[in-house]
């Protein structure tokens, strides 16, 4: 009888202590809008009686093992059973794989014709054109914008392939500009390379110049002016090349001939003075 009275007194004291602890906890958390316990240990510590754990009390049945089936118990085991996770686990595997795939729009032939006609007019349609296409094709405007982006990328790829087919990569010697640099501007080299001059049916003779020399230096361009005007070239390229050859090559010959004439005139008086005429 005395043991029962002692157990009842211990239970009453435990309840009173728990009520005081809850009251103190409510006062301390009065200024906070929300309180989230960090772990299950904090919650279990707030609900565990202060008395000896071996004693029989009113809260003896509150144990950590009893929470194994709850959300807190599953979080202790390392598995977080959130509602989204539970729903995903309940769905079959085929539905989960389909949800991960991108949604592809299948266009009809009439829709593709309308979109291609608009693309031929403008590769970058404005908002009004897209709205009109959405009304005609019964498509979403975002789908139309994505279709134009893919169509522009396909068009650029097609242009690159076409340019590679028209202009294949050549070597250094097969490049026309490099061939022109290699062959120079002399007629012998021009006659050996028939690639550039297949369109000309008659040969292009080199102009012969016969300048008149005098005692003074003369301008080589003036000496060859008559031959340049009489020569009828079929292309501006030949005129420039001939003018370049005539201004560079004959100038040295003209200067050498003029110097030879001057030296010849200077030697004639000396010979006349050394050999007096016989009477």
Swiss-Prot record:
Probable transcription factor. Required for initial outgrowth and pathfinding of axon growth cones along the ventral nerve cord (VNC). Involved in specifying neuron identity, in concert with nuclear hormone receptor family member fax-1, or with transcription factors unc-3, cfi-1, or hlh-34, perhaps acting via positive feedforward loops. Establishes electrically- and chemically-interconnected neuron circuits, acting by modulating the expression of neurotransmitter pathway genes, neurotransmitter receptors, neuropeptides, and neuropeptide receptors. SMART domains: HOX (SM00389). The keyword Zinc-finger does not apply. Gene3D superfamilies: Homeodomain-like (1.10.10.60). Keywords: DNA-binding, Homeobox, Nucleus, Transcription, Transcription regulation. This is Homeobox protein unc-42. Changing residue 146 to E: In e270; axon outgrowth, pioneering and pathfinding defects; mechanosensory defects. GO terms for biological process: axon development; axon guidance; larval locomotory behavior; neuron differentiation; neuron fate specification; positive regulation of transcription by RNA polymerase II; regulation of gene expression; regulation of transcription by RNA polymerase II. Expressed in 40 neurons located in the head, which can be divided into 15 anatomically distinct classes; unc-42-expressing neurons are unrelated by lineage but are synaptically interconnected. It comes from the Eukaryota. It comes from Caenorhabditis elegans. GO terms for molecular function: DNA-binding transcription factor activity, RNA polymerase II-specific; RNA polymerase II transcription regulatory region sequence-specific DNA binding. The lineage of its organism: Eukaryota, Metazoa, Ecdysozoa, Nematoda, Chromadorea. GO terms for cellular component: nucleus. Belongs to the paired homeobox family. It is found in: Nucleus. The gene is unc-42. Residues 100-159 bind DNA.
């Amino acid at each position: 009888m005395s043991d029962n009275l002692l157990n009842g007194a211990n239970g009453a004291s435990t309840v009173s202590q728990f009520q005081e602890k809850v009251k103190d906890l409510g006062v301390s958390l009065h200024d906070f809008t929300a309180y989230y316990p960090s772990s299950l240990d904090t919650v279990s510590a707030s609900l565990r009686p202060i008395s000896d754990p071996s004693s029989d009390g009113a809260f003896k049945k509150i144990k950590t093992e009893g929470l194994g089936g709850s959300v807190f118990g599953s979080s202790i085991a390392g598995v977080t059973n959130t509602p989204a996770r539970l729903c995903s686990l309940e769905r079959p595997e085929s539905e989960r794989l389909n949800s991960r795939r991108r949604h592809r729009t299948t266009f009809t032939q009439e829709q593709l014709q309308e979109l291609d006609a608009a693309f031929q007019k403008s590769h970058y349609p404005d908002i009004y054109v897209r709205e009109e296409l959405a009304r005609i094709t019964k498509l979403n405007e975002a789908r139309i914008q994505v279709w134009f982006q893919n169509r522009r990328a396909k068009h650029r790829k097609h242009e690159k392939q076409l340019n590679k087919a028209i202009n294949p990569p050549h070597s250094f010697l097969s490049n026309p500009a490099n061939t022109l640099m290699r062959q120079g501007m002399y007629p012998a080299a021009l006659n050996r390379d028939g690639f550039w001059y297949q369109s000309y049916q008659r040969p292009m003779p080199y102009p012969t110049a016969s300048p008149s020399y005098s005692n003074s230096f003369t301008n080589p361009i003036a000496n060859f002016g008559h031959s340049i005007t009489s020569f009828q070239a079929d292309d501006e390229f030949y005129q420039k090349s001939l003018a370049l050859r005539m201004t560079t090559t004959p100038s040295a010959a003209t200067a050498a001939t003029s110097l030879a004439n001057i030296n010849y005139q200077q030697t004639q008086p000396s010979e006349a003075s050394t050999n007096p005429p016989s009477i």
